[in-house]
Amino acid sequence: MSSLIPISTYNLALQPFNPVQAIDDEYPVTIRLTLAAVDPEAVDDKAEPSTLRLLKRSNLFVDDEDLDDDLLDIEAEEADELDSEEEEEEVKPKNKKKQNKKKVEEEEEDEDEEDLDIDGSSDEEDDEDVSEFVVCTLSPKVQFQQTIDLTITPDEEVYFVVTGSYPVHLTGNYVEHPADEDSEDEYDEDSEDDYNLTPDEDEIIGGEEYDLDDLEDASDIENKIEELVEEEAQGSKKRNAEEPEAPTSKKSKKAKKEDKKSVQFTKDLEQGPTGSTLVEEKTEKKGKKEKAKKEEPKKEEPKKEQPKKEQPKKEQPKKEEASKKFPTKTLLGGVVTEDRKTGKGQTAKSGNKVGIRYIGKLKNGKVFDKNTSGKPFVFGLGKGECIKGFDLGVAGMAVGGERRVVIPPKMGYGSQALPGLPANSELTFDIKLVSIK
């Protein structure tokens, strides 16, 4: 029994004279029963001890419905043959009719005997199909509980029934059985094609692309501003060279003052002087220096463009991470897990109180639920406090670990429709374990 790994707890309440199937068809997982306990409250006044019985049907026989259908077909064919024979006998002489009637009666007697043999054998087969076993007898006055060790697989058709005055409760575990893994091989092959569990580039890169784009836009704007300023400066110099130089001797003191004012004003605009030749020489030297300074950024422009060329190199590791395949595993019920990051410390198991962060998505990528901030979602693992796929998917994680869990409808909400969640939805959860107690 060492290969049977517990997954979650199993409980079944049995009322007297009410047969219950051991394994639910919607949750076909192997169970291991370890305890049977009696409820001290009787359902009648007889106060008779309760006997737990196991009813097991064998699948080695042919279905009764198929056998009945075959018998009906045979009887119909024989009836048609008899009708045709009777029509032919009416045309023949009376003496022949008498002989034929005797033959028909003999044939009918033989057929009746065969039918009786078939019916008797079918009843015997029905009795042989179902086997009844007594597991234990419990009573509040004598024995409250009994330890047992029964393992039942989904392939077995097993029912429990209680005879007596007291209800009986069964306790055990859902377990991982080697036979269950063999039955899930076909699903493993399909799941690799159906689910694209590799993260998108947007999920890995995040907002870094937007930051780089912003920097590129800023550098482009600065370069354009510098080019516009240089064009304006060159255009003003051409206009100044074409204008005739006015004689300084004819200018009045007021004109000189105005020239000085205009020169000071035009220096701020970097357009060069509009007055005397002395100021022109100074401004030409300054213009050359400024032009040299402005030409320097042009030489450095290839350096600014280098990050653009190197950017794909930086993104290559991220693209490699996006295309990297993470280890996947298919659990019972078709739940698929993909470990993105391995945590440290003890691993979560049935009975632990775990806290998680998660993002829940539908198959089309739409987010229907999430817990990314505030108080983490805390629940008891394996106690049925959440959907079955969560109990299976979180088991085995360590604190700091990240895992993607794909849950089929039967292990999620099934045919139940919720706001924003259609019925029979396949769910994908990105989970991070933050605490174990």
From Swiss-Prot:
Regulation of protein activity: Inhibited by both FK506 and rapamycin.
Location in or out of the cell: Nucleus, Nucleolus
Keyword Disulfide bond attached: no
Gene3D superfamilies according to UniProt: 3.10.50.40, Nucleoplasmin core domain
Pfam family, any one: FKBP_C
Disulfide-linked positions: none
Catalytic reactions on record: [protein]-peptidylproline (omega=180) = [protein]-peptidylproline (omega=0)
Keywords tagged on the record: Isomerase, Nucleus, Rotamase
SUPFAM superfamilies xref list: FKBP-like
Sequence segments annotated as region (Disordered): 73-132, 169-349
PPIase FKBP-type domain sequence ranges: 351-437
Name listed for the protein in its UniProt record: FK506-binding protein 3
Source species: Debaryomyces hansenii (strain ATCC 36239 / CBS 767 / BCRC 21394 / JCM 1990 / NBRC 0083 / IGC 2968) (Yeast)
